[in-house]
Amino acid sequence: MALLKVKFDQKKRVKLAQGLWLMNWFSVLAGIIIFGLGLFLKIELRKRSDVMNNSESHFVPNSLIGVGVLSCVFNSLAGKICYDALDPAKYAKWKPWLKPYLAVCVLFNVVLFLVALCCFLLRGSLESTLAHGLKNGMKFYRDTDTPGRCFMKKTIDMLQIEFKCCGNNGFRDWFEIQWISNRYLDFSSKEVKDRIKSNVDGRYLVDGVPFSCCNPNSPRPCIQYQLTNNSAHYSYDHQTEELNLWLRGCRAALLSYYSNLMNTTGAVTLLVWLFEVTITVGLRYLHTALEGMANPEDPECESEGWLLEKSVPETWKAFLESVKKLGKGNQVEAEGEDAGQAPAAG
């Protein structure tokens, strides 16, 4: 027994074909939007690849770009099919291809749904990538004279200014690394010598941060050096006073930015997926309604359309049997090839 059977007359078939034609062209626009979102995400990831240890994954943006292009192609073709569906002469050339085309549409819908899920799952991989990338980027902040790293100072400074953040997890991360180049240290100074000697690794560590950590909204001039020394500044207590620095770490700021971007992209992709599923269901009804016409030459005759020719369990059983037959066919072919090669070996 057919699943979700619906009766169609000529008027209903015409309305269905026209509605699907319009929906397909809206879906082409949706495909362009998905393509644009994928391209934008790819650019945003590449833009900050230096603070992601150059190990960021482009699987999701590449997938979005791919399904965006495929959506435009499939829906343009479906729009043409719907336009030709009510002309018997034009429909005849599409008839042999409709079943395979619908199967491809179902597969495309599955892929689109998986891509939407991947958008929501990207956060986990980004978190570890950002943690390692930012840590290494901060280590190379001082290497302004080293080829291949001379740009890192500008990259980190611009990042902290743009995202209003400081350090990896917070401003105290800068206390643990030497971010001032040896080129700008006076090694004849007793203070510099003492600081370097007091460190096991011979690094010049200070309780200070780069200028890009300063919050311009603070009414007080920026205090970026001797942050933990209350006596070094007038009317200052670092434990109780709200520091005029960005308190948020850059990892959290970037993760929040990319998470919002990915959640928005995932939501849009899910909406497009629902739209595509609706179109595929509509195409199935149009296909079965046209196939079920008793007299194709008489456009006025009634017909029946359905979603599945049999019930869900029967359809699933038939699908499994066809897969088994395909597997057995491949096995027989392989055995035949082995038998043909055996005499040659002897």
UniProtKB/Swiss-Prot annotation:
One of its GO terms (biological process) is detection of light stimulus involved in visual perception. Residues 42-62, 123-264 are lumenal. It is a multi-pass membrane protein. CDD domains: peripherin_like_LEL. It comes from the Eukaryota. Glycans are attached at residues 53, 229, 263. Residues 1-18, 80-101, 284-346 are cytoplasmic. It is found in: Membrane; Cell projection, Cilium, Photoreceptor outer segment; Photoreceptor inner segment. Belongs to the PRPH2/ROM1 family. Homodimer; disulfide-linked. Forms a homotetramer. Forms a heterotetramer with ROM1. Homotetramer and heterotetramer core complexes go on to form higher order complexes by formation of intermolecular disulfide bonds. Interacts with MREG. Interacts with STX3. Interacts with SNAP25. This is Peripherin-2.
